[in-house]
Amino acid sequence: MLYSPLYQSIRLILFGALGLSSLTVSAAINQTDSMMPEPLVTDSSNQYADDESIQESLKRLAEFYERTPDTNVATSNNTGTNVSDEQSNIQNSLTPVTTNIPTVGSNLRLLPHTVDSAARCEGQWVYPKKNPNYQRAVNEAGASNGQPAPNLNGLPNNQAPLFAESDYGYYDNVDYAELSGNVIIDQGTQHIEAEKIVLDLSNGVAAAQGKVMFTDQATGNASATQTQDRVQKNGKTSLTDKAAQGGLIGVADNLNYNTETGQSTATNVAFASVELQAHGYAKRLNRPNESQYELDEVMYSTCPPTNRKWQFDAKSIDLDTETGRGEAYNTTFRIADVPVFYLPYFNFPIDSRRGSGFLLPNASISSENGLEVDVPYYFNLAPNYDATLSTHIYTTRNPMLSGEFRYLTENYGEGIFNGSYLPNDKEYDGEDRRSLFYDHYWSSTSIPRLSGEAKYSHVSDADYLNDFDTLGLSDNTLNLARRAQLNYYNDYVDGELKVETFQTLDALNNNGQMLQDKDKPYSRLPQLNLDYRLPWAKNFDITGVSDSAYFKKSIDDGSENEKSGTRFYNKLSASYPMENSWGYIKPKLSLQHLFTSYDKDSLVDNSLDKDDGNQSVFVPQASIDAGLHFYQAGSPFGAFDDTLGGYRLLSPRLKYTYSPFKDQNNIPNFNTRIASINYEQLFSDSWFLGHDRLQDLHAFTPGINYRYIDATGVTRFDGSIAEQFYIDDGGVTLDNTKPVFTSSSSGLVWDTSTQPYNNVWVDVSGALTNSYDLNYITTELRYQPSDNSLFNVGFIKRQRDENTNQLPLSALTASAVFPINNNWRVLAQGQYDYNRNQMLDSLIGIDYEDCCFGFAVYGRRYYNDLNIADKPTQAIMAEVRLSGLGSGSSRLTRLLADKVLGFEPVQSAWKD
């Protein structure tokens, strides 16, 4: 029984203690997550560990560390295991799987088939058992009042009933009360134990004394069901969210609270977070007022208490919830009892509010830059704009300064500036190196579906991107865009108005010669594109395309005569689609018009008068596209009817296209090229990509698609094959060269995708010439023996194609990500050109993941895409990760996600 005059005061003790300790954990996490310098290595003990009081608190806290690596249940009374297994069985019974078709290699046992991240730890932090007397007392209180007992699940703690029990209780009916002997207080999900609790209102003092223990299960007991659901859904929760959810266990020697000033103090506090699986301690924890906290002799780690491999120690930490900032003094990062990093002072955030301060530093080694260390500093200038200034220190170059500025406006969009400057680069003949990039995005608040963007890019030289991107994460773009653009769309029109020019970097063309002015792209000053449809006819589809632009390209090196001017292209089409479940037929008529006009400089350069500089041409086009759909239940040849089941779809298709020849040799080519051959291209209306040429095409294209879908909806086979046959030779050329389409056919084209087993995928596509020699072939084999391993092998071979500027290539690609055991894995990726006998790109690394830390060491060797004749860049990188700190994303994972098909789910399985 709790006397009513004690209710509010004991609540203050409980909330003062728990709120203080919870904030301590949250502060440590936020500090390291967003503002701590990146740790290099880590440790387990510190200068305060010899303190007997601290050791006693840690020893008491360790009672809640359960050495049960096989369990997924974060509670000491593990009654939910059977529930978890039962739910897992139910889930498996509801999930359709093709159990009769085995996974390849399922019985080989060459690699671990599962990686259990929980087994990497010796145990886990668990909540103490709930006090059964609390719920019983709540039920009895409700019954005595003739009311049902309140449902405690989801009820805010400040609204939940307060329950207290002890061996002895005294109250003088005025201002003094005392509970002693096995004192227990419960309210909602919060629980406190002590040997004695004293309340003296005359002196304004409340205290909990002797073996104080408190818990805050604000997220509720982590039952087996909740844990299993989180695993099945691969759910991810941010560190800040986890800290805010509670899940705290704490022990202390005593707690003191001043009821008049609100000041509270705890000594020899040890705490653990169940959600974060982290723990720590503070020699003294003081709250002078409701918004300020002072911690002395602080430790924090996510390692097991029995084997603390790393930890952060601080002489003192001051937290201010009003400003959202914290200050740490004399902080040491330790690994295996060895201090490896020290900061005398740093300022960090304790909530989601931004604040100025140092960010995580980076370090790398490469053949271009030697050792590079980057130290960024963040400026929180205003709620809607900020900046980051970084200093880059190189062993082989002078220091470089780079900066980033971000802004967000209410009505004018958002943008970001990035720039850098390196004076007198010793590795680049003493030249200054610099860059500037700008991106802006805007959406209208007054006109729906109207948006805009602006982009600017500049680098000082062609080698800049390659030299200052250690692992080659940025695209080595030949033409850096500078663009301003407006976009609008609705149900009937999709429009784009833009002005665009480029900075073209020095590079080699396909013949190994330096690019000339004639090889550079045209600027569009401006260009207007419209795609529209007319809603007039009920059964007809009437659509149009309009592309108008002024193209400009100055020729200063005499590589060719200048050919700049305006181009107007329009196409109006009418089709009458007839569709049914068994097939379709789509006749279509189109009329195209192309008008070009040279500007004054081009007229002079080409010795043309104004009339000769204007060209206009009309080309009509007619086409019929028809197809059938045949459906049949069962598997191919009945081979899998008893196992996979499913159905088959056979879809033959035939398209006929006719457009007459119109001479266009005097029309300039601003940005048009011939499309690469593939299955879908055979059914398009033109082989020209761009609107400078109107193709004369008289051809028919037969094709067929076959699909097999099993009973679970998995497409086991999807294959297509087609060939375009030319009735008349094509006469339109790109650049006054010989006609392109003068053969009898395009050659055979195919595209197939197969999944013969649940963990094997095979993709093959290719094309033959009209004489049935090989044009190109690409294959990709993906094998995933387990959730955390992946093997890819690919092959590509293509012949030179003068029409499409396709270069010959014979290359092998391969990648592998696989665990050696529960802690170690190998990552590798490569691309080999066996015509040149040259490894174009290779990466190999090892990755280690432990209970509370991980690291990776990897190297990459790759060639500059802009100049394959250059020497390859070689880089070695090392990463250290501390569990529970940081986002988990790294340069290595970003690189592999781009290079390795299917890497991201494998990465999630390894981490989770």
Swiss-Prot record:
InterPro entries: LipoPS_assembly_LptD, LptD, LptD_C
Organism classification: Bacteria, Pseudomonadati, Pseudomonadota, Gammaproteobacteria, Moraxellales
Cleaved signal peptide residues: 1-27
Keywords carried by this UniProt record: Cell outer membrane, Membrane, Signal
Similarity comment: family membership: Belongs to the LptD family.
GO biological process, one term: lipopolysaccharide transport
Name this protein carries in UniProt: LPS-assembly protein LptD
Listed HAMAP family: LPS_assembly_LptD
Subcellular localization: Cell outer membrane
Task performed by this protein: Together with LptE, is involved in the assembly of lipopolysaccharide (LPS) at the surface of the outer membrane.
GO cellular component: cell outer membrane; transporter complex
Self-association state and partner proteins as the record states: Component of the lipopolysaccharide transport and assembly complex. Interacts with LptE and LptA.
